[in-house]
Amino acid sequence: MDKKMLEAENAAGGVVAPVLEENAPFSPTRREIIAAFLLYIGAYIYMGGLKSWRLAVFVILFIALTELLNRGKPRSWESWIWLGCTTVITLSLLLERAAVWEDFSLLFLHIFAVWWALSRSGGLLAGESGHLLPFDAMNGFALFPFRNFFLRIKTVCYALKGPFRGKKKSKPETVVWTIGALAAAGLLFWLVLRLLADADKGFAELISHWLLDLDFRIDGEIWLKLLFSLPVGAWLFGLLAGSARAEKEKLRLRGRRINDALNRLGKVPNLVWTLLTALFCLLYLLFFVVQARYLFGAFTRSLPEGFIVSEYARQGFFELCKVMAANFVLLWLVTRLSAKPLRENRAETLLCVILLLESMLFAVIAFSKLMLYISCFGFTPRRLQSSWLVCVLFFGCLCAGYSLLCGKKSFRAWMIFGAVSLALLHLY
């Protein structure tokens, strides 16, 4: 590069024009080549259904290839947490203990596996989990896989072209089509051989000894699995290799730009949010006063008149949880859309803290109703799910309050608490 610049300077009489570097030719690493070929097997196993040995083999292969592609890179401590959650859910499915979440367990397994791959490769926008969760999820499930969707076929073509590199140049597409043609010709040869054997008994007896060794039935389901495993494998390789190849400085820069864009949303006067937050706080306070006997009956194990335990415990439980979720949305709007930082306005900060305390009271009320129900009728998977939801919402209120009062980030702690508790419930 320096030599080129010197030559350009001499030729231009001291005036240097920018010298653009040529794009480097595509050259995958040996690790990427190994991963590309192994994922053909992994994707086919995946299409066979993630049960019993298939699940174990696929997860082990996914973890091994992720580690292979990111070997030598620094590992964040939280990546161990996501790997642990992935392992716990896998074991629960293998041991058939995923009674609490049932069919949702596979969905959670996919989410944790993708998040672990992002964390292990350093592919999270901020370098760690946090409030950029929606954008990181978009990267993990869409941008990385689909931007690098054809990376595997390019890698495979590069590897197959290796023995001929340095000789007469041949396009990667030529290699692929040649292999495809050989496979098709072999299949047609076997088919014609079978047809000739069916047409003539003498010919059938002549070749029966070695035809028996080639006698296998072409199962349509197998070909369908092979066909659909191709895009699945391309998606998986795009995720793993794409996140490993991503330039981390560009990712961090993009994360900072998103943060800057979020900070520029603050256009609403703080007084407006102060009045609106005060309105919500007064509404909840009025609700607590008017409905005190009904809401707090579970604490004294005294039911309101006309109610039975099951009706009292279930009525309004999910509505209370939805109110808490609505409060989180309101809190996000206040913190993001206020013209001035929230912590510079004491009245608004105090009202947000009161709102969180009322949300925590909603969680305690919902949990008391649930515990009354469980004490009478015992545990069931759905009641455990409900208990988990209330605990996660309550912990979220604590984290939000900590951030408001101390100005420190706590979203990652909330994510980890929710993830670890969800994974551990699979062991019930």
Which sequence ranges carry the predicted segments?
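N-terminal signal-anchor module of multipass membrane proteins
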Residues: 2-69
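Juxtamembrane membrane-water interface segments of multi-pass membrane proteins
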Residues: 11-33, 70-78, 124-128, 155-176, ...
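Membrane-embedded alpha-helical segments in integral membrane proteins
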Residues: 32-47, 87-94, 291, 366-370
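Transmembrane-helix bundle segments that line or gate the permeation/cavity pathway
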Residues: 45-53, 57-205, 224-249
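Hydrophobic membrane-spanning alpha-helices of multi-pass integral membrane proteins
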Residues: 61-66, 80-92, 181-191, 281, ...
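Short, highly charged, low-complexity non-transmembrane loops/tails of multi-pass membrane proteins
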Residues: 130-146, 252-257, 414-425
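Alpha-helical transmembrane segments of multi-pass integral membrane proteins
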Residues: 140-155, 176-198, 228-234, 272-293, ...
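Short aromatic-rich membrane-water interface segments that cap or initiate transmembrane helices
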Residues: 211-227, 305-322, 379-391
